[in-house]
Amino acid sequence: KNMITGAAQMDGAILVVSAADGPMPQTREHILLSKQVGVPHIVVFLNKEDQVDDLELVELVELEVRELLSNYDFPGDDIPILTGSALQALDAINNEPTLKKGDNKWVDKIYSLMESVDSYIPTPIRDVDKPFLMAIEDVFSITGRGTVATGKIDRGIVKVGETVDLVGLGDTKSTTVTGVEMFQKTLDEGVAGDNVGILLRGLQKGDIERGMVLSKPGTITPHNTFESELYILTK
């Protein structure tokens, strides 16, 4: 459930597979779900390389992953696959926080991974000119400030002081945006693609549920009937 919620907002993803163990059952599920919710680009990181003595085993895991990706209509032959050890890199940084690129091979492998992400996953084109819309992923209260709805802005721009509609369960409610925050920074506005927390005036936490949306007033109509395509996962 949590993976689907996060993946549905992604412009790209890093698929982490153990180089020591190879693809696991959940690897297949993650690839399937990524495809079905529309994750457009994937980069693969074969982790725990430090636990593998035979490089041929790493190459075998890479072939397995490429075949698995191709089976779900991802370009398995073209997707970048990087190797490394997240734990070794983390330990190196913790032991010597001033490490620079070129000082440690495990840290360098993480740099290489992020360079592949930057080069392979294109910068998405955002719908900033369309009316504001954000699906609510979570909601919580801040003592002394009010109620905050979090999520990724799908389109448009929202500014502090603007009126927005809360659409979904029950009657549509209007409220005023009193704050926009992203990664603990206060903003004047949020734009399409931003993962933000929006502080709302006059609403209680119980008024908002995950799955409701915030929108520019009058631009969204809720529906009781719709057609869908379902993918059922067994335990």
From Swiss-Prot:
It catalyses: GTP + H2O = GDP + phosphate + H(+). GTP binds at N47, K48, E49, D50. It comes from the Eukaryota. It is an enzyme of class 3 (hydrolase). PROSITE patterns: G_TR_2 (PS51722). This is Elongation factor Tu, chloroplastic. The keyword GTP-binding applies. Residues 1-125 form the tr-type G domain. Keywords: Chloroplast, Elongation factor, GTP-binding, Hydrolase, Nucleotide-binding, Plastid, Protein biosynthesis. It comes from Costaria costata. GTP hydrolase that promotes the GTP-dependent binding of aminoacyl-tRNA to the A-site of ribosomes during protein biosynthesis. Belongs to the TRAFAC class translation factor GTPase superfamily. Classic translation factor GTPase family. EF-Tu/EF-1A subfamily. Its EC number is 3.6.5.3. It is found in: Plastid, Chloroplast. GO terms for cellular component: chloroplast; cytosol. SUPFAM superfamilies: P-loop containing nucleoside triphosphate hydrolases (SSF52540), Translation proteins (SSF50447). GO terms for molecular function: GTP binding; GTPase activity; translation elongation factor activity.
